[in-house]
């Protein structure tokens, strides 16, 4: 079957931003103007096409990244609308991993917010080219050039306006295209009757200044363009367009556009810019991966190359499990068998689907550059590689952050107990930041996630989708343990109870590991003092002990263990004996390494009227917060701080009462830091009292 669109005319893009910047409304307008939907859905009415979960429609926020295909100007555009709430950061993360370009949406009033910085960093991590759409230009306080300054200062991006608004707030009449040097005046509320005209006389000087700045920025990206600019004093429209595109692809510049998605202004011009400036799959570097022999290899974006794809999302569906895939190379056909190279498992492709939010179109094949979904995969989870069996490769996977908060879940009845297991399995398959474990002491089921809202949504889904009635405990902070010193440890397990005994003996060295390494094991046994077959069990005993720590029962992180010596018995030694000896040696060593407790620190930004600044800073300090910066603009104060998560429960209610409902805040995970001794002692004694 021939391609519907050549690869050069495919765009895989994401729409990402801070919560409430207007991403979903922006996506809705794109679908309306490109003909996918014939009636505009509004987020505040709970009718947005991309918000298809019940919770999304109720809360007016996007939780899961909905993938939609549409067309514009003879191009296929695959769009992922990502959530802006920090608790759903994995949805943004996995979207960035499979996209070729991003539209970063900013509110013309709020500008750069903390979550904007997080999304920007995620796009940086995967080197995703991007453009900026400054939305909500119709709102009171909208200021396009202020947002331009914030993007340059706070995000350190070379933001270059390629448009200017004509008017602002209630007086937003249209948009200036700096590339074409034309004005677009909107004549109706639907944004379909647009008059193209000359630049208004009162804006000629301003437009001339910004057009010159645009030319200078583009001339700096390429020597040929610089010569043309110096020779002629300006660049042609074609040179401007090719220069912007080249600058975007090389991450040299970020074009800035503006409009109001809600008021239907600027969306068609945004679609034109997506087609003109964001990359096709063939414009980005080919995906890298590892061959079975450990050598690096690449897969070009080409139908003729061996098939490879990345599973970037798994979702429960009334018809079975839906696995979203980004096709990187080759062709995937319905009914074929492929290899899951991450798990070394064969998979059958039952059905292939292209999605339009909760609408779907069955297809016979997916090709390089496509975003689609597969029905019927048994073993594939988020981050797995699918490839041709005879041309195996494992692609770079996803970065998955650790959960920071947990709650105990107790089913109300026996039938709820049976349904709970199924619900938790299904939800954890969908969301890798959602973890399920059993508390060894209480035998309770514990679920962990990225924040209170994250767990609230998941518990809500258990009730709605899986009909599980459960009691939910109070939120608990996910503390960690680590060590600050080095030492050695020894474990000898010897039992003689008639007949065959048990014997295992290991000696280890323990030291702090590099941040982010978790548990690192090195085998330095020489001369066979511990036979090869007992090394893995000894390591396993240490890893298991790591899971429950040594001072307060929390997982131990960033520890390096080196196995240096030991002994065995020809008859009595066994894998179990060495597993126990490994655990004993680990506990012995860790206790001598100055173990400490770590807690998740949150980056908290609070925005309040100036009058409340003093009480806000005082309150943050009382919560063990460290104020890292503050600013005052138009009577509004912004305070940036780092606060322990343990001190932030119930903060929304407290902030409302302190500011008479006029304060807002955002919070995201920053890092793990050592808990002060007096606080740590209370946590440790509480945990030891419970054990």
Curated annotation (Swiss-Prot):
Protein localization: Cytoplasm
CDD domains linked: EF-G, EFG_III, EFG_mtEFG1_IV, EFG_mtEFG_C, EFG_mtEFG_II
GO molecular function annotations of the record: GTP binding; GTPase activity; translation elongation factor activity
Swiss-Prot/TrEMBL keywords: Cytoplasm, Elongation factor, GTP-binding, Nucleotide-binding, Protein biosynthesis
UniProt cross-references to SUPFAM superfamilies, sorted A to Z: EF-G C-terminal domain-like (SSF54980), P-loop containing nucleoside triphosphate hydrolases (SSF52540), Ribosomal protein S5 domain 2-like (SSF54211), Translation proteins (SSF50447)
Domain named tr-type G: residues: 8-282
Residues binding GTP, per UniProt: 17-24, 81-85, 135-138
Keyword Iron-sulfur: no
Keyword Zinc-finger: no
One of the record's GO cellular component terms: cytoplasm
GO biological process, one term: ribosome disassembly
A Pfam match: EFG_IV
PANTHER family: RIBOSOME-RELEASING FACTOR 2, MITOCHONDRIAL, TRANSLATION ELONGATION FACTOR G-RELATED
Family: Belongs to the TRAFAC class translation factor GTPase superfamily. Classic translation factor GTPase family. EF-G/EF-2 subfamily.
NCBIfam families, A to Z: EF-G, PRK12740.1-3, PRK12740.1-5, small_GTP
Protein function: Catalyzes the GTP-dependent ribosomal translocation step during translation elongation. During this step, the ribosome changes from the pre-translocational (PRE) to the post-translocational (POST) state as the newly formed A-site-bound peptidyl-tRNA and P-site-bound deacylated tRNA move to the P and E sites, respectively. Catalyzes the coordinated movement of the two tRNA molecules, the mRNA and conformational changes in the ribosome.
Protein name: Elongation factor G
Organism: Prochlorococcus marinus (strain NATL1A)
């Amino acid at each position: 079957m021939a391609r519907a669109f050549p690869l050069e005319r495919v765009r895989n893009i994401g729409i990402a931003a801070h919560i409430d910047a207007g991403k979903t409304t922006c996506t809705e307008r794109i679908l309306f103007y490109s003909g996918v939907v014939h009636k505009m859905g509004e987020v505040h009415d709970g009718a947005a096409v991309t918000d298809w979960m019940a919770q999304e429609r109720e809360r007016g926020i996007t939780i899961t990244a909905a993938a939609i295909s549409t067309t514009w100007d003879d191009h296929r555009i695959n769009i992922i609308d990502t959530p802006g709430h920090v608790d759903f950061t994995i949805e943004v993360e996995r979207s960035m991993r499979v996209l070729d370009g991003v539209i970063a949406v900013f509110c013309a009033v709020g500008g750069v917010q903390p979550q904007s910085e997080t999304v920007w960093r995620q796009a940086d991590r995967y080197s995703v080219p991007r453009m900026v759409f400054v939305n909500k230009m119709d709102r009171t306080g909208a200021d396009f050039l202020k947002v331009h300054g914030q993007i340059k200062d706070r995000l350190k991006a070379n933001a270059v306006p390629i448009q200017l608004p004509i008017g602002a707030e209630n007086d937003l009449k249209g948009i200036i295209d700096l590339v074409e040097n034309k004005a677009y005046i909107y004549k109706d509320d639907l944004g379909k009757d647009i008059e193209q005209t000359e630049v208004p006389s009162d804006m000629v000087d301003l437009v001339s200044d910004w057009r010159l700045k645009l030319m200078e920025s583009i001339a700096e990206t390429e020597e040929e363009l610089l010569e043309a600019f110096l020779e002629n004093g300006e660049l042609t429209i074609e040179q401007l367009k090719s220069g912007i595109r080249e600058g975007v692809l090389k991450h040299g510049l970020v074009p800035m556009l503006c409009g109001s998605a809600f008021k239907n202004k600027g969306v068609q011009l945004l679609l034109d810019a997506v087609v003109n400036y964001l990359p096709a799959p063939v414009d980005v570097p080919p995906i890298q991966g590892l061959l079975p022999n450990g050598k690096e290899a690449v897969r070009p974006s080409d139908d003729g190359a061996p098939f490879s794809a990345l599973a970037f999302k798994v979702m429960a569906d009334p018809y079975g499990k839906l696995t979203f895939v980004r096709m990187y190379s080759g062709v995937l056909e319905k009914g074929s068998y492929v290899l899951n190279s991450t798990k070394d498992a064969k998979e059958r492709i039952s059905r292939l689907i292209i999605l339009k939010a909760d609408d779907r179109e069955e297809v016979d094949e997916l090709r390089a550059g496509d975003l689609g979904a597969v029905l019927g995969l048994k073993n594939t989870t988020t981050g797995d590689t699918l490839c041709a069996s005879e041309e195996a490769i494992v692609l770079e996977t996803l970065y998955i952050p650790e959960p920071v908060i947990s709650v105990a879940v107790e089913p109300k009845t026996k039938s709820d107990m049976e349904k709970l297991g199924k619900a938790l399995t299904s939800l954890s398959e969908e969301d890798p930041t959602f973890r399920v474990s059993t508390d060894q002491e209480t035998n309770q089921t514990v679920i962990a996630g990225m924040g209170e809202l994250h767990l609230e949504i998941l518990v809500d889904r258990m009730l709605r989708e899986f009909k599980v009635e459960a009691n939910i405990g109070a939120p608990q902070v996910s503390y960690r343990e680590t060590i600050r010193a080095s030492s050695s440890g020894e474990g000898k397990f010897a039992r003689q109870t008639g007949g065959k005994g048990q014997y295992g003996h290991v000696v280890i060295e323990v030291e702090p590991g590099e941040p982010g390494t978790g548990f690192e094991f090195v085998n330095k046994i020489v001369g066979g003092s511990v036979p090869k077959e007992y090394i893995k069990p000894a390591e396993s005993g240490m890893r298991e002990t790591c899971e429950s720590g040594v001072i307060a029962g929390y997982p131990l992180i960033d520890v390096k263990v080196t196995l240096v010596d030991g002994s065995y018995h020809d008859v009595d030694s066994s894998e179990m004996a060495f597993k126990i000896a490994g655990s004993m040696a680990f506990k012995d060593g860790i206790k001598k390494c100055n173990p400490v407790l770590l807690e998740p620190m949150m980056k908290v930004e609070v925005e309040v009227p100036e009058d409340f600044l003093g009480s806000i800073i005082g309150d943050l300090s009382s919560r063990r917060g460290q104020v890292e910066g503050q600013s005052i603009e138009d009577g509004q104060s912004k305070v940036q701080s780092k606060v322990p998560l343990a001190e932030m429960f119930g903060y929304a209610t407290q902030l409302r009462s302190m500011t008479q409902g006029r304060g807002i805040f955002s919070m995201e995970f920053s890092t793990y830091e050592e808990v002060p001794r007096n606080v740590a002692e209370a946590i440790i004694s509480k945990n030891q009292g419970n054990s």
